[in-house]
């Protein structure tokens, strides 16, 4: 889901921490993007009836007219020979080129950020792998325009996992807003988040404390500490305690949730993942045939039983709104385990990677800002009001979501013929054509962002907040609000809040840290090599 191929991007210069609103227009394509190796450490809301406020920003809906002043250009690219073309593109995507180079090389070849290509998995899982690729910040938002695209069964792209993996139901993520159950199920999630908002800060702090105890012990006894596994355990504990008031360790599930979820997620996403096996093995077992759901049935049942018990009051509410307890439970499971936990599995290591690589100067500034605000505004405690006085911390979170969005791939199918615009040209899209956006290119568009491939910690401070509409990790602009009428993440504000709490809790306790960064099939693999406790 989130890009795991971003480890060679330019690192932040810790001596240059200035806001970066749009600068002088850059060349028309991304051919000038720098690739420098950087291996050194370097409408519901969590906040009530209103979303997180972005000062000075008023979101404008996209124009409904197909009128354009740009030259109409035929969409470049092709799909190759039937059968052969999709397989060749799949091999390029996973092995011959890799994901980043797959998109970049075609962008340079066609001199266009909009072109035609095949997306994995292709034969023999997806019957139609043909897509129109969108790689710039102007064309990409059409994927959020519900008047132009539909989202039915497109959550994972050109294929949909078997409903046997989700209790026989098409889960909310696969429903288009036009479908009746979409409104009921999304409203159920909105209510859950709103009703439990007062538990988020204390339960995050408690779960983060457990995480710190594990990594500190490993550092003291082994000299290094693997971050991902204890962070994944802490993330599930937080979600369970914040949403349901239940400690997993006190249930039959124990500490098994992360391993059970990881296996189940693999069965959902295997056709679009590379897990490090030999090419021939992956092609034969992951990319050409579906893994049998039966192999993960017992694991999934354990998760289902946990949520049947833990989410009892939520299931009661679902019944009152006309949703069966069974369907509601499978949807709650998916929202917590796949959407939320799966997102944190990628986002928390990403925060550690980019902040860790930024170095001591940024660490010191964050520690000073966070501790000062806690004392002056929070009365010594982490509060919502205190976090609003931490502009650098908030910017760091948004910059991480910009440079490495947890969900990199997004799709939409054209409902009608319409004109699609990029920065340089306009293109005729036909009804039924599949549109695909690779978000890490759209959110590093050099026509929007200065130094787009660098992690600029205070990019969104001051005038930089005007760039917030181009942060689109949530399946919509950061300046817009999730509602039952769109497909923006129901937990958008919740995820941002958790990411902020992660940074706050980290620098409340520690002055600085050092890391080693590796890769995994989903996100970065982080090893802590040092943690310096708070000295002021």
UniProtKB/Swiss-Prot annotation:
<dbReference type="GO" id="GO:0004497">
    <property type="term" value="F:monooxygenase activity"/>
</dbReference>
<feature type="binding site" description="axial binding residue">
    <location>
        <position position="489"/>
    </location>
    <ligand>
        <name>heme b</name>
    </ligand>
</feature>
<comment type="function">
    <text>Cytochrome P450 enzyme involved in the biosynthesis of oxylipin jasmonates, important phytohormones acting as growth regulators and signaling molecules for plant defense. Functions as an allene oxide synthase that converts hydroperoxy fatty acids to unstable allene epoxides. Catalyzes the dehydration of 13-HPOTE ((13S)-hydroperoxy-(9Z,11E,15Z)-octadecatrienoate), as well as 13-HPODE ((13S)-hydroperoxy-(9Z,11E)-octadecadienoate).</text>
</comment>
<feature type="binding site">
    <location>
        <position position="339"/>
    </location>
    <ligand>
        <name>(13S)-hydroperoxy-(9Z,11E)-octadecadienoate</name>
    </ligand>
</feature>
<feature type="transit peptide" description="Chloroplast">
    <location>
        <begin position="1"/>
        <end position="58"/>
    </location>
</feature>
<feature type="binding site">
    <location>
        <position position="345"/>
    </location>
    <ligand>
        <name>(13S)-hydroperoxy-(9Z,11E)-octadecadienoate</name>
    </ligand>
</feature>
<keyword id="KW-0934">Plastid</keyword>
<keyword id="KW-0349">Heme</keyword>
<dbReference type="GO" id="GO:0009978">
    <property type="term" value="F:allene oxide synthase activity"/>
</dbReference>
<keyword id="KW-0456">Lyase</keyword>
<feature type="binding site">
    <location>
        <position position="487"/>
    </location>
    <ligand>
        <name>heme b</name>
    </ligand>
</feature>
<keyword id="KW-0479">Metal-binding</keyword>
<dbReference type="GO" id="GO:0020037">
    <property type="term" value="F:heme binding"/>
</dbReference>
<keyword id="KW-0443">Lipid metabolism</keyword>
<dbReference type="GO" id="GO:0016705">
    <property type="term" value="F:oxidoreductase activity, acting on paired donors, with incorporation or reduction of molecular oxygen"/>
</dbReference>
<comment type="pathway">
    <text>Lipid metabolism; oxylipin biosynthesis.</text>
</comment>
<keyword id="KW-0150">Chloroplast</keyword>
<dbReference type="GO" id="GO:0005506">
    <property type="term" value="F:iron ion binding"/>
</dbReference>
<comment type="similarity">
    <text>Belongs to the cytochrome P450 family.</text>
</comment>
<feature type="binding site">
    <location>
        <position position="182"/>
    </location>
    <ligand>
        <name>heme b</name>
    </ligand>
</feature>
<keyword id="KW-0809">Transit peptide</keyword>
<feature type="binding site">
    <location>
        <position position="151"/>
    </location>
    <ligand>
        <name>heme b</name>
    </ligand>
</feature>
<dbReference type="Pfam" id="PF00067">
    <property type="entry name" value="p450"/>
</dbReference>
<dbReference type="GO" id="GO:0009535">
    <property type="term" value="C:chloroplast thylakoid membrane"/>
</dbReference>
<keyword id="KW-0276">Fatty acid metabolism</keyword>
<keyword id="KW-0275">Fatty acid biosynthesis</keyword>
<protein>
    <recommendedName>
        <fullName>Allene oxide synthase, chloroplastic</fullName>
        <ecNumber>4.2.1.92</ecNumber>
    </recommendedName>
</protein>
<feature type="binding site">
    <location>
        <position position="339"/>
    </location>
    <ligand>
        <name>(13S)-hydroperoxy-(9Z,11E,15Z)-octadecatrienoate</name>
    </ligand>
</feature>
<dbReference type="GO" id="GO:0031408">
    <property type="term" value="P:oxylipin biosynthetic process"/>
</dbReference>
<keyword id="KW-0408">Iron</keyword>
<dbReference type="InterPro" id="IPR001128">
    <property type="entry name" value="Cyt_P450"/>
</dbReference>
<feature type="binding site">
    <location>
        <position position="262"/>
    </location>
    <ligand>
        <name>(13S)-hydroperoxy-(9Z,11E)-octadecadienoate</name>
    </ligand>
</feature>
<dbReference type="GO" id="GO:0009941">
    <property type="term" value="C:chloroplast envelope"/>
</dbReference>
<keyword id="KW-0444">Lipid biosynthesis</keyword>
<dbReference type="InterPro" id="IPR002403">
    <property type="entry name" value="Cyt_P450_E_grp-IV"/>
</dbReference>
<feature type="binding site">
    <location>
        <position position="186"/>
    </location>
    <ligand>
        <name>heme b</name>
    </ligand>
</feature>
<dbReference type="GO" id="GO:0009695">
    <property type="term" value="P:jasmonic acid biosynthetic process"/>
</dbReference>
<keyword id="KW-0925">Oxylipin biosynthesis</keyword>
<dbReference type="InterPro" id="IPR036396">
    <property type="entry name" value="Cyt_P450_sf"/>
</dbReference>
<dbReference type="GO" id="GO:0016125">
    <property type="term" value="P:sterol metabolic process"/>
</dbReference>
